[in-house]
Amino acid sequence: MPHSYDYDAIVIGSGPGGEGAAMGLVKQGARVAVIERYQNVGGGCTHWGTIPSKALRHAVSRIIEFNQNPLYSDHSRLLRSSFADILNHADNVINQQTRMRQGFYERNHCEILQGNARFVDEHTLALDCPDGSVETLTAEKFVIACGSRPYHPTDVDFTHPRIYDSDSILSMHHEPRHVLIYGAGVIGCEYASIFRGMDVKVDLINTRDRLLAFLDQEMSDSLSYHFWNSGVVIRHNEEYEKIESCDDGVIMHLKSGKKLKADCLLYANGRTGNTDSLALQNIGLETDSRGQLKVNSMYQTAQPHVYAVGDVIGYPSLASAAYDQGRIAAQALVKGEATAHLIEDIPTGIYTIPEISSVGKTEQQLTAMKVPYEVGRAQFKHLARAQIVGMNVGTLKILFHRETKEILGIHCFGERAAEIIHIGQAIMEQKGGGNTIEYFVNTTFNYPTMAEAYRVAALNGLNRLF
């Protein structure tokens, strides 16, 4: 690369996408700077999203497990923890993650610059530093990995102390008895699980007709039933007309005429890209209505020297995929093309209580495609390992082609689902006839394990053939 610029590449953002790009670039010998607007590296994933919410979920699920276990619990006195106590656990995990990721940059001699970046021209950035000064930086190429933030409608007062989004909920200081959650997407469902697990009343407002409609319908129905059984009130096909804040809580007026009152509101309906402060108009780039950028298969924007990865390009908006996108973009940036590509079937992990995970096609998709598939199921309650640890709620479902035995989709509902799914994913990715449900019958599993669910499901499915 020519060395007439300060850097070969500047990466804007240090979340999973930015980290993947930065590490990929420095490993190829590029001079790289990473710009991070906040004091610590890691981005929204580490500080407000994936890591803290999953740490919260883990703490709450352990409390539920303790209270439901007859060996350890005294049913005259349930174990309880305050939201602040559980947040302390999340803070400890965040600190560990931050130190680890900071070490990645230091060991690889990748410069971290703190401040807000904005484009001046095609190869120049202005960096607004925390001390009020402004630095000018130049680079031959750029990677935009600035992430996303919760969408804020203009008619909702997010400055009110009882109205939260999925970022600010982590700074909640009071103990709510009743929570309204508007938006029943992944974030809304995960927090519904967390609050209900803390014995908080939850009203979950869904703007659609069922939960997480992109899932296999049985998985969606399982979550709905589990929420209903645990006391979460789900209100489908509802939209708010206005949100009224008061000293002791929030009143939500729905377009259907209903009124709901709770101690606080978590607004979790949509996200928008963090592109509004980048002055993209100065380099001729435009975003869509959600602040997202369009890219090609190598993550190039309409400006060939500017790449974008992660939440800022939309689907799939997963930390795991963002890291791979950054790595692929780094390869394309240095070599002009990328030999690596994002896998076709990206696994989905949803950290409700219990978890949901899936990879590949759903039953609804296969039916619409007129694919002759069969189903193999394993109920967790029939597995020795699940009985030992008390994980009786859950199921593993394998969808496979009736004739070729090729695995077409795997769906799991239950504790550890996000871990269990990867066993099946590994077989699905095999080439040359290696992707077959018969693998699970012909291999030997440790016993007792949750992985054994694959053998049970495979036998169940193969026994349906005639």
Swiss-Prot record:
FAD binds at E36, R37, Y38, Q39, N40, V41, G42, G43, G44, C45. It catalyses: NAD(+) + NADPH = NADH + NADP(+). InterPro entries: Class-I_Pyr_Nuc-Dis_Oxidored (IPR050151), FAD/NAD-bd_sf (IPR036188), FAD/NAD-binding_dom (IPR023753), FAD/NAD-linked_Rdtase_dimer_sf (IPR016156), Pyr_nuc-diS_OxRdtase (IPR001100), Pyr_nucl-diS_OxRdtase_dimer (IPR004099), STH_gammaproteobact (IPR022962). It is an enzyme of class 1 (oxidoreductase). GO terms for cellular component: cytosol. It is found in: Cytoplasm. Keywords: Cytoplasm, FAD, Flavoprotein, NAD, NADP, Oxidoreductase. Its cofactor is FAD. Its EC number is 1.6.1.1. SUPFAM superfamilies: FAD/NAD(P)-binding domain, FAD/NAD-linked reductases, dimerisation (C-terminal) domain. Its main location: cytoplasm. Binds 1 FAD per subunit. Gene3D superfamilies: 3.30.390.30, FAD/NAD(P)-binding domain. One of its GO terms (molecular function) is flavin adenine dinucleotide binding. GO terms for biological process: 2-oxoglutarate metabolic process; NADP metabolic process. Homooligomer; probable homooctamer. Belongs to the class-I pyridine nucleotide-disulfide oxidoreductase family. Conversion of NADPH, generated by peripheral catabolic pathways, to NADH, which can enter the respiratory chain for energy generation. This is Soluble pyridine nucleotide transhydrogenase. The gene is sthA.
